[in-house]
């Protein structure tokens, strides 16, 4: 009987320790995504960064680099993950989701994604699966951006072996997610992505492309 009590006590203590460790991990990771950038790990031939011929906002920085810098600058504000509706479309309370990384990246280059998507829905409404258009949220849905970029952006290879085709500032769309392609690469030459997937994400820049089998599209914004 005494041994049984000891076993029960030890089991309870082990369970308590596990619960405490899980709680600590939850507190450390929840909504504490780091904006620290990953190190460049590619040691092969130099892959020149693509530069767009466009400079929409006239700041002396081409659109491709502007979009990349816009994504980096946005995640440097440390947005917390939350899906919510905003009357003005763009989140203004320090929260956001994956589509907001892309929207703010394009905004820094001089493009209002909310307005662009809204106008495109007016023109190509039959291409979008939308019953009642709402410009405040339509541009923040991955399924709509998939249609939008297919219609309005340059569509590129989704083959990760074609590493030079993947450039910082490109846009990649997965089944239920979207991200900006980073200008830094892993040891295979495959670029990282800058994205916002969930409240437990360790860093905004992550090496995930090779882990995904659901890449639906790879795009470059050359529509000035």
What are the functions of these language-model segments?
Residues 107-113, 185-187, 217:
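Bacterial peptidoglycan biogenesis and beta-lactam-recognition machinery
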Residues 76, 106-107, 184, 198, ...:
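Residue-level marker of positions within ordered structural domains that often coincide
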Residues 189-224:
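Low-complexity, Gly/Ser/Thr/Pro-rich intrinsically disordered linker/tail segments
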């Amino acid at each position: 009987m005494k041994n049984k009590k000891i076993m029960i006590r030890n089991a309870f203590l082990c369970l308590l320790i596990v619960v405490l460790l899980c709680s600590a991990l939850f507190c450390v990771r929840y909504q504490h995504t780091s904006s620290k950038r990953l190190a460049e790990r590619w040691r092969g031939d130099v892959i020149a960064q693509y530069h767009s011929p466009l400079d929409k906002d006239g700041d002396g920085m081409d659109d491709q680099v502007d979009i990349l810098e816009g994504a980096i600058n946005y995640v440097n504000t440390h947005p917390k993950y939350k899906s919510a509706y905003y009357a003005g479309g763009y989140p203004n309370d320090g929260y956001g989701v994956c589509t907001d990384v892309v929207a703010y990246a394009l905004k820094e280059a001089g493009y209002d994604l909310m307005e662009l998507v809204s106008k495109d829905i007016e023109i190509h409404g039959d291409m979008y699966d939308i019953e009642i258009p709402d410009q405040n949220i339509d541009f923040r849905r991955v399924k709509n951006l998939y249609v939008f970029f297919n219609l309005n952006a340059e569509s590129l290879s989704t083959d990760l072996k074609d590493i030079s085709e993947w450039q910082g500032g490109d846009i990649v769309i997965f089944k239920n997610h979207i991200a900006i392609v980073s200008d830094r690469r892993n040891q295979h030459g495959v670029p990282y992505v800058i994205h916002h997937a969930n409240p437990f994400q360790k860093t905004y820049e992550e090496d995930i492309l090779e882990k995904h089998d659901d890449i639906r599209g790879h795009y470059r914004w050359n529509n000035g």
